[in-house]
Every structure is written in structure tokens, then in C-alpha cells.
């Protein structure tokens, strides 16, 4: 459920990949609009690829619901959901290898300031559900309590910058935290072996901890600064896709929005659909996670997927202040609500 450990490496490779590819797949730019069935005649469905950021989980449920319920077929589309390749989802989307994928505001921001043409077209979750988590026996109740503890991460400069930001607010010193790369170990293995806390999405790892009977102290980063209440994850496309085939994006988001709306209204049924599509997932975890996460997809937004300019501006300003990006972001170009369906 956490972001890829190779985000920075993938971003560094994107410009090379884009230069090599330079064009969208012909299948992504061919005309194939309209419903799957009209007037008794069946039209050929248009194949559309979507790449996940990680293994399937409840961040992705709306996609699987829309696929199972035929919402994509109603738009004349046949969705193929892919796992990311070695270069990562952002590279695949930015290069035009696939038209859509899961990304994060953080990586879209980093990418765009390096000339990578990613654009966020929908927020999967309206508010940041991530934060620093520790078993309760580590007595981490506030950011200052990170002092003297060991943090396990994936090696991104963003981690220490966020930690420093919230520790500064609480009067703590980030230099008193031991930071290590936890590698491929999962959270539960790592906290038993060599770390005290890590950055998690509560909807997955936090819910799993509840089911295991291993209570956590959870410090949500958004609770310490409005600038850290950013969109994670998002659905992204690339600038060429927007220019060449905006109607495909509209059709894709009409179906996807229906999938997430269904998951909001029917979390248990949506969980069953995800489990049917990915039977290797833990049933109890998926159901409990879906119940926790479904209300948070849209939350206080006017419609699912909607993004605010202020959220993009605030977070990119924070990244620039912390020297995580080399120049300010043109926030208006980094996202768009133009392709989301209007509320009915």
C-alpha cells in the first residue's frame, strides 16, 4: 500500500524514457467512441491499459468495480489493469506506454519540475490518510517522541523532510532520529527486528494491525500542517493524451467515477468484487480496509476525484521550501478537474 521505493530512481529515468518513446501507442489515439451497444448493434470495445502503483489493494477498488460492473463497457472501453514494470507506473504513463495509472501528488510534483509531462486527473482519496506509525510499546505519542528511536523507510529525502517539519512543530530534533532503509521487509517484520516506527497508509497496514491485535500509535502528517494534506494517491495521464484524445479521458473517468461511487455506497460488495478479481488478497483485511476507506474516497469534496488548486500549491510550496524540488511548480498545469463527470 505504500509508494514504490524506487520513485526517485524512476523519475530520474523518465526523461530518457520519454525521449526514447516520444509518442503514444497507436491504440491509445485511434477513434473508438460510443457505447458498447447501441440500437442492437455491438461495437468493438477499445482496449485501454491502466497501470497500478503497487499490488492491488483498496486504493484501487473503484477500478475493479467499474470493470466487473460493466461501466467501462458502457463507455465502449475494455480496461486491462497492469502491475507496474521495473521503471514504475509514472514512467509508463509519462512515456505514453499506457494512458492512465496510479501516482501520487509528490511524484507528479517532482516529475513536472523535471520536465516530465504527468498530469493528475482525479484524486482517489480526498485527504492524506498516511502517517508515522509505531507499536504502542514504543511510546511514540507525538513527533518529539521520534527522538532516540529508529525509523525504517525507503530512502526518499521526502521522508526526513516531513519528519523534520512535524518534529519542529513539536519541539523535536530530527537529528536525534536514526534513519535506516528497511528494504523489502514489511512493517510488522521490521518493527520486531530493527525499527521503532515507519510511514504507512492506515487503510491497509493500520487496519492489518487492528486485525492482528497489534495496536499502533498513529501520527497522521496532515494533522500537523495543512501543507501535508496532499492527494495520495491520484490517477494520472500525460500531456499528449490530453491533447490527442480528451474524449477517451472523459469516458474513462465516467466509468471510473461510477466504480468509486459504488464502492462508497456499497463497501462490502465492493470488497467482494476486489477479492474476486484478486483472490490471493486477505479477505478479512480487504473487507475491514474497505469499510474504513470507502467514506474517505470523496469525503468533503463536491464529487469523487475533485482536486483543489490550493492543495497542489501548498504542497509544492512546502517541497520547494524544503529543497525537495529545484524550482516552483506550476500548480495549475499539474492537475485538472476538466475530465471528471458533473454531479447529477
Model-derived regions: residue spans:
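Short, solvent-exposed loop/beta-turn-alpha elements that line the ligand-binding surface or hinge
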Residues: 74, 144, 221-228, 296-309
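Short amphipathic alpha-helical segments at helix boundaries and their inter-helical linkers
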Residues: 98, 102-103, 295-306, 341-344
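Conserved C-terminal helix/tail region of periplasmic/extracytoplasmic solute-binding proteins
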Residues: 312-344
Amino acid at each position: 500500500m505504500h509508494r514504490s521505493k524506487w520513485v526517485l530512481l524512476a523519475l530520474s529515468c523518465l526523461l530518457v524514457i520519454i525521449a526514447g518513446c516520444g509518442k503514444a501507442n497507436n491504440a491509445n489515439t485511434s477513434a473508438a467512441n460510443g457505447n458498447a451497444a447501441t440500437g442492437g448493434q455491438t461495437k468493438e470495445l477499445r482496449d485501454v491499459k491502466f497501470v497500478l502503483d503497487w499490488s492491488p489493494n483498496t486504493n484501487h477498488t473503484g477500478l475493479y468495480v467499474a470493470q466487473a460492473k460493466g461501466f467501462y463497457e458502457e463507455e465502449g472501453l475494455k480496461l486491462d489493469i497492469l502491475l507496474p514494470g521495473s521503471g514504475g507506473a509514472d514512467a509508463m504513463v509519462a512515456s505514453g506506454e499506457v494512458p492512465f495509472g496510479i501516482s501520487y501528488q509528490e511524484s507528479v510534483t517532482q516529475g513536472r519540475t523535471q520536465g516530465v509531462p504527468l498530469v493528475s486527473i482525479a484524486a482517489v482519496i480526498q485527504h492524506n490518510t498516511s502517517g508515522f506509525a509505531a507499536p504502542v510499546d514504543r511510546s511514540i505519542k507525538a513527533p518529539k517522541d521520534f527522538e532516540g528511536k529508529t525509523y525504517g523507510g525507503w530512502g526518499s529525502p521526502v521522508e526526513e523532510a516531513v519528519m523534520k517539519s512535524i518534529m519542529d512543530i513539536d519541539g523535536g530534533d530530527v537529528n536525534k532520529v536514526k534513519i535506516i532503509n528497511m528494504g523489502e521487509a514489511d512493517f510488522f517484520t521490521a518493527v520486531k527486528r530493527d525499527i521503532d516506527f515507519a510511514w504507512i497508509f492506515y487503510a491497509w497496514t493500520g487496519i492489518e494491525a487492528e486485525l492482528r491485535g497489534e495496536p499502533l500509535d498513529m501520527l497522521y502528517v496532515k494533522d500537523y500542517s495543512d501543507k501535508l494534506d496532499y492527494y495520495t494517491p491520484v490517477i494520472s495521464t500525460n500531456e499528449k493524451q490530453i491533447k490527442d484524445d480528451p474524449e477517451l479521458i472523459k469516458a474513462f473517468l465516467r466509468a471510473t467515477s461510477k466504480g468509486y461511487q459504488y464502492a462508497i455506497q456499497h463497501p462490502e460488495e465492493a470488497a467482494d468484487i476486489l477479492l474476486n478479481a484478486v483472490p490471493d488478497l486477505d479477505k478479512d483485511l480487504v473487507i475491514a480496509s474497505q469499510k474504513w476507506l470507502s467514506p474517505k474516497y470523496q469525503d468533503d469534496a463536491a464529487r469523487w476525484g475533485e482536486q483543489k488548486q490550493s492543495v497542489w500549491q501548498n504542497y509544492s510550496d512546502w517541497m520547494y521550501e524544503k529543497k525537495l524540488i529545484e524550482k516552483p511548480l506550476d500548480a495549475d498545469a499539474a492537475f485538472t478537474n476538466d475530465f471528471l463527470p458533473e454531479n447529477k
